[in-house]
């Protein structure tokens, strides 16, 4: 269960910077020219704002509710945000999709960290907490590389359709592995 939740954290972290190489293509896709690069900053900052905004809220919710359900809900929000982003042909829709991705992705972190508290006794939590932190950072580092690989084969929208597919697979795995309440 922790492996699947950690993979979800890595997926969301990768999305922070996966758009770096796709930014100009995304701008063109919503009708913004390269000469207006400053208008594209919300594509990245919208994700980050959503990501950061939900950290304390989801942390508290995961203390009160079933952590697995919180994880599943966050994965669904992330998948919906990814689909909205992939379908966007206007900047406000693209930003909305990115914010939704951030909200879903940001919620995965505290829910996964709380899951560690359920699965390990206090004196054994160091390693699993380190794993979650490491995969989050690895996701951030690999995001631009993954974006480049996808862009070599397809358009920028494929990045987000792959997110949808990965989120749904992780949803199924977490649902199956965590069929008991955690």
Region roles according to the model:
Residues 8, 71-77, 81, 97, ...:
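Residue-level signature of the transmembrane alpha-helical cores
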Residues 26-27, 61-62, 146-154:
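Interfacial helix-cap and linker-helix signal at transmembrane-aqueous boundaries
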Residues 22-53:
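Extracellular/periplasmic helix-loop-helix junction of adjacent transmembrane segments
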Residues 45-59, 109-113:
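Central cavity-lining transmembrane alpha-helices of secondary-active solute carriers
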Residues 101-134:
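Cytoplasmic helix-loop-helix junction between adjacent transmembrane helices
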């Amino acid at each position: 269960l922790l492996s699947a939740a950690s993979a979800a954290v890595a997926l969301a972290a990768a999305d922070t910077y996966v758009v770096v190489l796709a930014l100009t293509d995304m701008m063109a896709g919503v009708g913004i020219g390269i000469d207006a690069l400053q208008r594209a900053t919300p594509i990245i900052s919208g994700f980050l704002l959503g990501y950061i905004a939900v950290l304390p809220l989801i942390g508290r919710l995961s203390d009160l509710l079933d952590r697995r359900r919180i994880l599943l809900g966050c994965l669904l929000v992330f998948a919906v945000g990814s689909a909205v982003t992939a379908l966007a042909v206007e900047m406000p829709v693209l930003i909305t999709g990115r914010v939704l991705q951030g909200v879903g992705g940001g919620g995965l972190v505290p829910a996964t960290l709380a899951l560690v508290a359920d699965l390990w006794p206090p004196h054994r939590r160091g390693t699993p907490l380190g794993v979650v932190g490491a995969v989050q950072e690895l996701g951030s580092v690999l995001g631009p590389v993954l974006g480049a690989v996808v862009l070599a084969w397809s358009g920028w929208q494929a990045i987000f359709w792959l997110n949808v597919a990965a989120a749904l697979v992780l949803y199924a795995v977490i649902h199956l592995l965590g069929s008991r309440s955690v």
